[in-house]
Amino acid sequence: NDWTLMIVTADVSGKGVPASLIMAEVRASTQLLVSMKVGLVELTEKLNALIHQSTDKKSFVTFFAAEINPVMRSISYVNAGHPPPLICSNGAVSPLSRGTFPLGMQALLSGLTVRDAAFQPGDFIVFYTDGILERTNPQGEQFGEERLAGYIRKNARSGVGPFVEQLFAEVEKFGEGRDPDDDATVAIIRFV
């Protein structure tokens, strides 16, 4: 409806042209299915079937889709193997549900359910890909969800632009100049 915002974050295993082609297929299919007004579970199940049929079974896609209703102050979401977004409310940071297997790994997704969460003005959600969590330093340590949650708590009052810029700088600093093993994406939704 007019009051609902949909956000999707996804990440394809692998690199290069094959991964790019899979992501293009996911993006186009998601846009088509959303325009057909399918629900979150049906959207995810149809994408899973498509990816399972059209890939080599070694490729998979982590996928998180959410419908945000600012009037009801609610978020409904499904998670297929994607790192759970972190919601910050009054300085407390907690993950949304981890969900089920990534898309394409199995012909049918078992245990896929719509979850719900509420938010208040001032809360925000951080959506990200595993390139943030899996950034390693020379000692082999990963940046991880705990460091990310700590960063969110420490910088909760920052504007969205500076928050994201500083997060990437923090992750880069943690890597101590090493090239990242994976790309990274971050998106923020702040509720007013």
Positions of predicted regions on the chain:
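Conserved subregion of the PPM/PP2C metallophosphatase catalytic domain
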Residues: 1-13, 17-24, 28-192
